[in-house]
Amino acid sequence: MENKREILKVVDLQKKFHKLEVLKGISTTFHENEVVSIIGPSGGGKSTFLRCLNLLEQPTSGQILFDGTDICTIKGKAIDHCRQRMGMVFQQFNLFNNMDVMHNLTAAPVRIKGMSQSDAQEKALELLAKVGLADRADAYPSQLSGGQKQRITIVRSLMMDPEVMLFDEPTSALDPEMIGEVLDVMKDLAESGMTMIVVTHEMRFAREVSSRTIFLDGGVIGEDKPSHELFSHPESPRLVTFLNKVL
């Protein structure tokens, strides 16, 4: 990764909720075009870490350097601008139920980025075609399956041209038969060169698609190494135990 630009650098990140210390000094770096999966047991701090990266949770201490700027110190509109540069896909779909797909996709680019309605619609149709939903532009969320909703949610993030995509267990709320269609979109996105940080329970995705995997347990990084190495030669007893349970 020496020749790849550092997009995010996390230094001694800590997060406390009252007296509960959820993140206990996380340090790691994410590079351009890298796909990193974050795995680990429930309650280990994975989602909190991801939410800290785009300031949905305010870190208690430490630094998050986004293109060299410590975003832990920014306020107001600067936070909004930062979040525009980081797409986020949650477990739940968070689509506007009173809008059809096209309006769900074009509202933010038109209102926030100043894109013309025609350009936004053209871009939306192009992205919908890439995720196999070109025929659903006029549908409302209530008319879509869970897998379709999550693919639309991914497209909505891509409409803002993010530099990094954050995924917080994007398949955990889906029926089993719909998981594959969302993972296929994420795999295509990874192959296109998008920088991605993915909290996931999908071990096959982590092993086969991610260039690197982080094992987060008890608020600390247990292992952080290339995915094939982490899965083939786990070193820590905690990781061995975890993989034996989930593989």
Indicate where each model-derived feature is located.
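ABC family nucleotide-binding domain
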Residues: 5-227
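C-terminal boundary and immediately downstream tail of ABC-type ATPase nucleotide-binding domains
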Residues: 215-217, 222-224, 228-247
